[in-house]
Amino acid sequence: MMARVTFAHALRSEAARLRRSPLVWRHAVLATVLGGLAGAYFAFSAWDSLMGTDAFFQLLGAGAPLLAGISCGLAADAEQRAGEAANLLGVSSRRSALAAKIVALLGLGLAAAAWAAVLFCAALALAGRPMPELPALALAVLGIALGSACSYAIFLIVALKWGRNASIGLGALGFIAAMALLGGLANGLVTGTFSGALGAEAAALVPFAWPSRLATLPLEASIASAMGAAGQARALASAWTTVALACVVATAVVAAAVLACANRFEGRRGGE
């Protein structure tokens, strides 16, 4: 009788395999380049560094669906080449294996976002530029991860069923949608407005928009509070709550659906 694979065992296995995966250094290089260059730019440019930080986190959040699509696509491709995804679909507990893969990839994305944020903020600090409060920055990083969880669950299934390109294409669509809902790249920085609140009710219904909104709204609320705009800060905090609740509920539903259907899921066959 085949031994049952627990989630903890599957997660340890994923962690060990990730240490040898090119996904780790790709995430590290991307985060280093993005955080370092953006930090150096806003440390010495004439732009307001508070709004520059907001714009940077908007970019991080908007890019999260694309990163998720690429990560899930490459991970599924590697599983397919290693043995037609037997490590995920051929084990005694697909639920544990799939959940561990999703959590491992999400953790890698969180680590990349955190490292990029650290480099960006370090550059501003060394230049003596003002930044939002540390709790708001931490909440922004965690918001990117929370907002991305649903995308990772969906994209991994898409990649296993229809291949790497389908997952990456869906991630690219998510990046475009997230930026469009914010009014474009650096819209708030250019206009001097809190663009995180732009169409927040509609953004709460779009999973691709969650990482960027959950990243930018706590920062904008912190900035507004520091400016003495208490009413605006409360409105931004309320918008964050709306998006966060929608994200948590929908993510729980998607996770439950993925786990419930895991044992009936069929991936690609060797020739497909």
Where do the PLM segments sit?
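Hydrophobic alpha-helical transmembrane segments
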Residues: M1-G61, L67, G228-E272
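Transmembrane alpha-helical core residues of multi-pass small-molecule transporters
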Residues: L30-L34, A104, G171-A178
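Secretory targeting signals
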Residues: V33-A68, C72, I102-A166, Q232-T241
